[in-house]
């Protein structure tokens, strides 16, 4: 397929020239009232309640399936006509000159005929710091998103799309200063893998700081979060081992487990009864064919599930781990730094001793404004991983500026530098998350997740509403992320609001007014009232929501979970 003459690459944009005070405000909004803070409480000793999953009316589910059916029929008709009358435009799907097609017509159908129709809603180019506001680069397509051209326009949008939980995405401040100083001292790259010449004193300092913050004996840092999981399991699992994984675990965990060669069994998301039954069953059955006992059994779950906004039932997982002599792995990519009274993730939320979790994994991209990932565990496990992990021997180590950003953000959260700032950031994101979640529920939207989760999924269902919502919000200068199959179940398309401490209460009010307006136009307010405190009021007026919810969101009785 040839590239059209009018195709252009993403343009290079000049940095925005603004006074320092305005630039700072655009990246991290000033707290407008001490009343817009919330101190997260630990759930120590409290069981995790069963999540209340609201469902839409039957006609919405029916229309969603019908929507997909129409798209599939039209796509197959398009394919048939194209491969019959325009073969030169479909060479990658047809045999030609004795060559097999590059792609299977069936395997690529979803991407070509469904996703491409809404591709303008994904991977939108941006420039500048993704803080409170993000600068979006305007683009246009004249061929149903096959190619894009760029108008040159750049416009700021309120940022609900970035994993900037604590607002450390800033061009000025203690973290940026530390990163710039590290460039002068260490350059921008360490020059090799960790096992050779790639280890500096910054790596050692970061690992000690992470281990102390998490509450484990030692830690190991990596240059890529996805690669941390993808390469981890191969070091201590083989075909004689069993992994029992939550069905909604991240693809990086799935990739890593597959590469290890271990057997895999999945349990329904959050179903602890089903998990225990599966563990007992596998202990009895043992390995396939031989029925010998499994060499080791590893339970894998995420601390905070990024598509659902739900927490794992960590106390029950630890109980099952001890009862059946299994190992436990928890991925805290989205919970570490952003959740818990002091930002120490699900262990702190539930009052679980980190020593009861064998391996704690996390990333630096979400709460810390950096990049890379870490593994925290007992000393002997980390020592073994330093020898066996291929990423230690063959991958580039974390660059010094990224390490400096990570170290300074960790020190800010823990109060070692800039006392009080870390606490304020944690209390701001907690308030913002609870306020937006409760307000959306009161407006009538179906929202998933727990009260304090900074990930707030709002259900859209029909695939046609996904691009409509995204485009209408972009017109209102609000950047959001829409998500569909295969990242979610087929009929549960959603918009995922990523909350940040950088947003102010006025920002959320602005967001709520426009989400309510768009929700009315797209008929998205379809909850049944299950999420309301009294179970009676299913719809609130937007002005009443904005007036009453900031105080109500601080009271746990208004949240079913």
From Swiss-Prot:
Swiss-Prot/TrEMBL keywords: Acyltransferase, Cytoplasm, Endoplasmic reticulum, Lipid metabolism, Membrane, Pyridoxal phosphate, Sphingolipid metabolism, Transferase, Transmembrane, Transmembrane helix
TM regions (residue ranges): 57-77, 443-463
Keyword Transcription: no
Disulfide bond annotation, renumbered to this chain: none
Pathway: Lipid metabolism; sphingolipid metabolism
Protein name per the record: Serine palmitoyltransferase 2
EC number(s) given by UniProt: 2.3.1.50
Highest taxon, organism lineage: Eukaryota
Misc remark: Present with 54500 molecules/cell in log phase SD medium.
Subunit structure comment from the entry: LCB1 and LCB2 encode essential subunits of the enzyme and form a heterodimer. Component of the SPOTS complex, at least composed of LCB1/2 (LCB1 and/or LCB2), ORM1/2 (ORM1 and/or ORM2), SAC1 and TSC3. Interacts with LCB1 and TSC3.
GO MF entries: pyridoxal phosphate binding; serine C-palmitoyltransferase activity
Family recorded in the similarity comment: Belongs to the class-II pyridoxal-phosphate-dependent aminotransferase family.
Membrane topology: Multi-pass membrane protein
Amino-acid biosynthesis in keyword set: no
Modification type N6-(pyridoxal phosphate)lysine: residues: 366
Cellular localization per UniProt: Cytoplasm; Endoplasmic reticulum; Membrane
Effect upon mutating residue 366 to T: Loss of activity. No effect on interaction with LCB1
Species this chain originates from: Saccharomyces cerevisiae (strain ATCC 204508 / S288c) (Baker's yeast)
A Gene Ontology BP annotation from the UniProt entry: intracellular sphingolipid homeostasis
Function: Catalytic subunit of serine palmitoyltransferase (SPT), which catalyzes the committed step in the synthesis of sphingolipids, the condensation of serine with palmitoyl CoA to form the long chain base 3-ketosphinganine.
One protein family per Pfam: Aminotran_1_2
Catalysed reactions listed for this entry: L-serine + hexadecanoyl-CoA + H(+) = 3-oxosphinganine + CO2 + CoA
Cofactor dependence: pyridoxal 5'-phosphate
GO cellular component, one term: endoplasmic reticulum
């Amino acid at each position: 397929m040839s590239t059209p003459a009018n195709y252009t690459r993403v343009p290079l944009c000049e940095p925005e020239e603004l006074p320092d005070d305005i630039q700072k405000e655009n990246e991290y909004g000033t707290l407008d009232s001490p009343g817009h803070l919330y101190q997260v409480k630990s759930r120590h000793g409290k069981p995790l309640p069963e999540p209340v999953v609201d469902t839409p009316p039957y006609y919405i589910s029916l229309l969603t399936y019908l929507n997909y059916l129409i798209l599939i029929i039209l796509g197959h008709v398009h394919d048939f006509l194209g491969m019959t009358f325009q073969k030169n435009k479909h060479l990658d799907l047809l045999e030609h000159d004795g060559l097999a097609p590059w792609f299977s017509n069936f395997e690529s159908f979803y991407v070509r005929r469904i996703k491409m129709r809404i591709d303008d809603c994904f991977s939108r180019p941006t420039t500048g710091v993704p803080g409170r506001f993000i600068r979006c680069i305007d683009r246009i397509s004249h061929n149903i998103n096959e190619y894009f051209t760029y108008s040159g326009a750049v416009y700021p949008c309120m940022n609900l799309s970035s994993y900037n939980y604590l607002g450390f995405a800033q061009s000025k401040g203690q973290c940026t200063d530390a990163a710039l100083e590290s460039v002068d001292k260490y350059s921008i790259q360490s020059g090799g893998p960790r096992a050779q010449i790639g280890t500096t004193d910054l790596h050692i300092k970061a690992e000690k700081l992470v281990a102390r913050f998490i509450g484990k004996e030692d830690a190991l840092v990596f240059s890529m979060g996805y690669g941390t999981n993808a390469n981890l399991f191969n070091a201590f699992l083989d075909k004689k081992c069993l992994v029992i994984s939550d069905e909604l675990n991240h693809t990086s965990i799935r990739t890593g487990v597959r590469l290890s060669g271990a057997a895999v069994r999945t349990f329904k998301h959050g179903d602890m009864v089903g998990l225990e039954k599966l563990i007992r069953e596998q202990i009895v059955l043992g390995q396939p064919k031989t029925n010998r006992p499994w060499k080791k059994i590893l339970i894998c779950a995420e601390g905070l599930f990024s598509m659902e906004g739900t927490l794992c039932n960590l106390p029950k997982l630890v109980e099952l781990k001890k009862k059946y002599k299994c190992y436990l792995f928890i991925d805290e990519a989205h919970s570490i730094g952003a959740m818990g009274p002091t930002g120490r993730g699900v262990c702190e939320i539930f009052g679980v001793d980190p020593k009861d979790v064998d391996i704690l994994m996390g990333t630096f991209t979400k709460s810390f404004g950096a990049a890379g990932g870490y593994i925290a565990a007992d000393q002997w496990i980390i020592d073994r991983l330093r020898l066996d992990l291929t990423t230690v021997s063959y991958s580039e180590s974390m660059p010094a500026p990224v390490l400096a950003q990570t170290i300074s953000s960790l020190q800010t959260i823990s109060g070692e530098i800039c006392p009080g700032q870390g606490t304020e950031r944690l209390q701001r994101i907690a308030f913002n998350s609870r306020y937006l979640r409760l307000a959306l529920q009161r407006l009538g939207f179906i929202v998933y997740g727990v009260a304090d989760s900074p990930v707030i999924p709002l259900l859209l269902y029909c695939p046609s509403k996904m691009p409509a919502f995204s485009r209408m919000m972009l017109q209102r200068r609000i950047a959001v992320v829409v998500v569909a199959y295969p990242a979610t179940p087929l009929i549960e398309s959603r918009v995922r609001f990523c909350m940040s401490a950088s947003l102010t209460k006025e920002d959320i009010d602005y967001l709520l007014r426009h989400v309510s307006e768009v929700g009315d136009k797209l008929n998205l307010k379809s909850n049944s009232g299950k999420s309301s405190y009294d179970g009676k009021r299913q719809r609130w007026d937007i002005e009443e929501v904005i007036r009453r919810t900031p105080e109500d969101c601080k009271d746990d009785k208004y949240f079913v979970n």
